[in-house]
Every structure is written in structure tokens, then in C-alpha cells.
Amino acid sequence: MSRLQFQLQTTDGHARRGRLTFPRGTVETPAFMPVGTYGSVKGILPEQIRALGAEIILGNTFHLYLRPGLDVIGDHGGLHGFARWDGPILTDSGGFQVFSLAHRRKITEQGVTFSSPTDGARVFLGPEESMQIQKVLDSDIVMIFDECTPYPATEDVARRSMELSLRWAQRSRQAHDGLGNDAALFGIVQGGVHPDLRSRSLDGLQAIGFDGYAIGGLAVGEPEHERNAMLEHLHPRLPAERPRYLMGVGRPEDLVEGVARGVDMFDCVMPTRNARNGHYFTSFGTVRIRNAKYERDLDTIEPGCGCHACSSGYTRAYLRHLDRCNEMLAPMLGTLHNLWYYEKLMADMRAAIAAGTFVEFRRSFYAARGATTPPLPGESS
């Protein structure tokens, strides 16, 4: 039996308010998971992550397996002890990185052989290996090993990729159970932007049985309208009693639109990566701190924001100065702000769903940006 319990508390339209419960803590949903690729969220401490409002983080199986390796992490009793994070952790399977980062890869029915991006050594990774790695990491949510369908892809390519992922899903389930791992195991729906393939993928995953269902292959360059169409197609077909996770997405607008279409969980490197490039998210849009207009700007990133950077009074002019001088403090403060913004956005959406005011929240979200609220299915534009 999985260590995860999921409670769907209420809905507002298709938006869902719920709670994930683990022995290591609870996660209120909809939730955003900061990404700790190498076992840390770049530039900030674990206790700062918690103070920002994050309740779960993501670790990267592919990178942690290659460096420092399982022996070192195993010496610490798993990723929680290694990273000094005592809350829940989700680990991806390594599949996306194999297909996006690995060099000279060869895909067979058994798995993928590739050249390590760290030292060029030949490495094999398949469903059984991924499940074994994630067992050593001792994550609370384990992702199956799958092939991330590229975009664009013909329907035939997407079909063959989806069918391979389904066979790997069955092997992932068997390997996970064979290891006696009580972590939650999530299936990943693939199929590109083809509704019938998405349906077949989900049907196959449900026949195997998983603790939650992720939607993969929708952060690979497809247009926003195609991503939303796939979410709308899947919403009534996904089991209501299981959590839903949209992988690798994305912008604040993407989170709002995902929640509006029934998504419970998100992850993305955007708030941390963009902070390191001087892009700070606010309720009125993005502050690009390298712009010359901020050279003598005495405002904080977003006046009234409760993050450490804004509440301490660091000005845009100061942050621009730090960024231009390549001072470490610039991305640290920017990361604190961006993650605060993302976690506050999720908290505000949870409150709106609970109050039955998500439609009004969504309108005010776009109005603050000077944008028109895009219509949902069934609404007039």
C-alpha cells in the first residue's frame, strides 16, 4: 500500500482543491514544486524553501544517479538526509533528461543506452534501473520510466512512442512492487497532441493502476492552445480520486490555466532559472531588471510583496547593480522573490477554489496584467 493519501476537498468548475498526505508531511493542492535538480534548489537553503510556502520539492533521478551516485546518497539514508529536506520529495524517472540531454542515445525495448553528459561514459537506463535508483533515493513520489514524445511528431511516431511508454509503465509497476517500495508511483500519460493517443495511454495506465497520473510531453514546445486542448480532453477521463500532475509547466499563466483545467501539481525550473537571468515575476507581469529604466528605481520588485527581497527593502536599482556586477546576491534574492510569488499564487488559487470564487480570481489575475481573460471551453470570448 502506498504511503500517499489524497483527499479531494472541493471543486470550483474544473479547478480542484485537495490535500496530499505523507508520513513526512502534507501538501495542499494545487501545489507548485520547486525543482532541486542536483539535490538543492539553486541559491537558497532548505529552511528558506519551507518559509516560502513550499511543502514538496522535486529531485532529478538522472543527474543524481550520474553524480554523486547512489553510494554517496545511500550513505546518507536517501535524498532527504543528503539534501537536509525533511518534507516530501518527488523524483522524476530520468526519462525526460535521457531524451533531452543525453548524447548518442540508443532506444531499444529494454531501455536507453546513452553517453553520460558528465564524463562520456556509456550508461544504460531502463524501467527497472529507474525504479531501483528511486528506491535508493527514498522519494515519496516515484515517476515511471517513459519516453517523452517530441514535438512536433507525426501521429505514427507519437503512437509508437506512447505504446513503448505503456510497456515500460507495466515494467516500472512490477519493478517498483518487487522492490517492496511503499512510495507512491505515478503513471505518465503520453501521446503528443493527439487526443485518441492520450486516451489510449490513460486507459492503459489505469488498467495497470497507479497512485497518481502525470501528464507528460506538454512542455516540449507545443503551442499553448494545443496543451490546453489536451488538458481539456483528459480532465473528464482522469480518475477524480487520484492526483494529477502536469510535468514541466511553467509560466504563471500556465499554472492558472492548468488549475482551471483540473491539474493538482506542477513543477518548473522557470522561477529559479529566470531569477538567475534577472527576470522577476510579479502580479502585473515580469520585471526584467537588466532594463536601463531600473537604474535609479527605488521601488522593490513588487511593492507590498512579502518575500525577503521586497520586505527587506532591496530596490530594483540595487538588484540591477548586483546583476550587472555578477554578484551572487542578485540571483539569491531573485530566487527568493520568484518562488515566493509562485507559492503565493498557488495559495491564492487554493483559497479562491475553497471560496467558490476561482472564476473571479482568474479574471483579476489577467486584469492585473492588462490582459484579457482567455475563454474556457463553453464560454464566449
UniProtKB/Swiss-Prot annotation:
Its EC number is 2.4.2.29. It comes from the Bacteria. Binds 1 zinc ion per subunit. One of its GO terms (biological process) is tRNA wobble guanine modification. Pfam families: TGT (PF01702). Zn(2+) binds at C305, C307, C310, H337. Signal peptide: none annotated. SUPFAM superfamilies: tRNA-guanine transglycosylase. Keywords: Glycosyltransferase, Metal-binding, Queuosine biosynthesis, Transferase, tRNA processing, Zinc. One of its GO terms (cellular component) is cytosol. The active site is at D92, D267. Residues 248-254, 272-276 are annotated as: RNA binding. Its cofactor is Zn(2+). Pathway: tRNA modification; tRNA-queuosine biosynthesis. Belongs to the queuine tRNA-ribosyltransferase family. PANTHER family: QUEUINE TRNA-RIBOSYLTRANSFERASE. This is Queuine tRNA-ribosyltransferase. It comes from Xanthomonas campestris pv. campestris (strain B100). The gene is tgt.
